[in-house]
């Protein structure tokens, strides 16, 4: 359920864009949807995940700049900044001696430290790649292509990467009896 609620602002952005073909309307919808998502998380759980706060901050700042300056490039940077923040966060936690992935998944998977490090570097590299790829698509293709890439390309590549990581991690995942 959390995955769907986190994805909802992206889906509403996509829907608003394809209904209106207006990046500014879609941006306003994404800002509102993200604010509602964070408010709902707070109302329901009395807690908001760090990534939801970061996403809200980015959409308000970059989406707000898009609307105020009437420049779509600010909103096009949002996925890149989010990917790079996530990748940097993983690396910073690794260098600080607290593997971020282990903190998130350590209860489900028991692995040696070198494997956690490899996984952290793989995810950080993937996020760096995705951020750069988003900018490449944003600046070298049409607005329509970028909007489609934001939903389908980004999600498709993420799914492929998760499958590849799952195959790598399969030997460490214990079956529940």
Swiss-Prot record:
Domain of life of the native organism: Bacteria
Membrane topology: Multi-pass membrane protein
One CC-aspect GO term: plasma membrane
Spans through the membrane: 23-43, 50-70, 73-93, 119-139, 149-169
Disulfides per UniProt: none
The entry's keywords: Cell inner membrane, Cell membrane, Membrane, Transmembrane, Transmembrane helix
Protein name from the UniProt record: Inner membrane-spanning protein YciB
Organism: Chromobacterium violaceum (strain ATCC 12472 / DSM 30191 / JCM 1249 / CCUG 213 / NBRC 12614 / NCIMB 9131 / NCTC 9757 / MK)
């Amino acid at each position: 359920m959390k995955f769907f609620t986190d994805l909802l602002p992206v889906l509403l952005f996509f829907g608003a864009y394809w209904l209106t073909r207006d990046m500014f309307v879609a941006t306003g919808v994404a800002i509102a949807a993200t604010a509602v998502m964070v408010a709902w998380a707070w109302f329901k759980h009395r807690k908001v995940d760090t990534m939801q706060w970061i996403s809200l901050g980015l959409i308000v700042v970059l989406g707000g700049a898009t609307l105020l300056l009437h420049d779509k490039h600010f909103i096009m940077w949002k996925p890149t900044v989010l990917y790079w923040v996530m990748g940097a966060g993983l690396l910073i936690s690794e260098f600080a001696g607290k593997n971020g992935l282990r903190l998130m998944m350590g209860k489900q998977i028991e692995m040696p430290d070198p494997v956690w490090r490899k996984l952290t570097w793989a995810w950080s590299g993937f996020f760096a790649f995705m951020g750069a790829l988003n900018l490449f698509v944003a600046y070298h293709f049409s607005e329509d292509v970028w909007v489609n890439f934001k939903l389908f390309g980004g999600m498709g590549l993420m799914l492929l990467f998760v499958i590849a990581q799952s195959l790598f991690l399969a030997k460490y995942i214990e079956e529940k009896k």
